[in-house]
Amino acid sequence: MPELALLEEVVEKVRPLLGQGKVADYIPALASVDAGKLGIAVTTVDGETLGAGDYLEPFSIQSISKVFSLTLALTLYEEAEIWSRVGKEPSGHSFNSLVQVELERGKPRNPFINAGALVIADLLQSRLGAPKHRMLELVRQLSQNDKVCFDKQVADSEYQHSARNAAIAYLMKSFGNFQGDVDTVLRTYFHYCALKMNCADLSKAMLYLANRGKSITGTELISQVQTRQLNALLATSGLYDGAGEFAYRVGMPGKSGVGGGIIAVIPGELSICVWSPELDGNGNSLAGTAMLEHLSQRLGRSIF
């Protein structure tokens, strides 16, 4: 376990970067977040959690939820059913691109861009009677926090600005790769993105990625092989168009969200969550990436 002093050092090291990024403003409910927040939490495979900075302040997890939705799909479907509808390759296009969906005849490149996550939400919608409730159950169980909830204001705000995601869903539907009612699936998808959690919650919830598929309670969520495969996808596609840069600087599987959170994993050791709302040009937390880079260097850890 890293010492508390190291986590505090990491937070202070990146503080001068504040003001260099830009808070997501295309979702009005996210635009009002205090840009000066910085938090980090780590959870070890022994179940111990440590944090520094604003690590107990809840934020909108946004695309980090795509890890939970894919994990949930892996518990409900045969893998062939999932991967026949969504690929495993980095996209090279923006996360909300329509161009690639058109060129590749409705099959998204990976489950972590919007098109891929919408297919996963479609799969969950068709197999679960109450997909929103099931997701809430899962993240509460994984984080050991019954207070985790959806931020209805954020979900509604995203739904009111959902033209592009609706266009992606209808385009995939035209190719036969979207089964459900678009409006219903979009509402489920936006609720997932609007989950509100803090760094401690997320570092605990993602521990299964560091612990061979076993959650903080020791329950097996997915198999050891599936965990390794999921980490591989996170390493290649978890950071939008910044995945290569992140692999170079941080060297860990990770997933970001436009709420400013990033989760990262050192397999066999610990899971990490950082948060700083200001984003870089790829939509990844600017100071958050720097915190992970500094931590990785100080711990001497990388999967490469």
From Swiss-Prot:
InterPro entries, per the entry? Beta-lactam/transpept-like (IPR012338), Glutaminase (IPR015868)
Cross-referenced PANTHER family, in alphabetical order?
Answer: GLUTAMINASE
- List the NCBIfam families: Gln_ase, PRK00971.1-1, PRK00971.1-2
- Keywords in alphabetical order: Hydrolase
List the catalysed reactions. L-glutamine + H2O = L-glutamate + NH4(+)
Protein's recorded name: Glutaminase
> Which Gene3D superfamilies does the record cross-reference, listed alphabetically?
DD-peptidase/beta-lactamase superfamily (3.40.710.10)
Please give the biological process terms from Gene Ontology that the record holds.
glutamate biosynthetic process; glutamine catabolic process
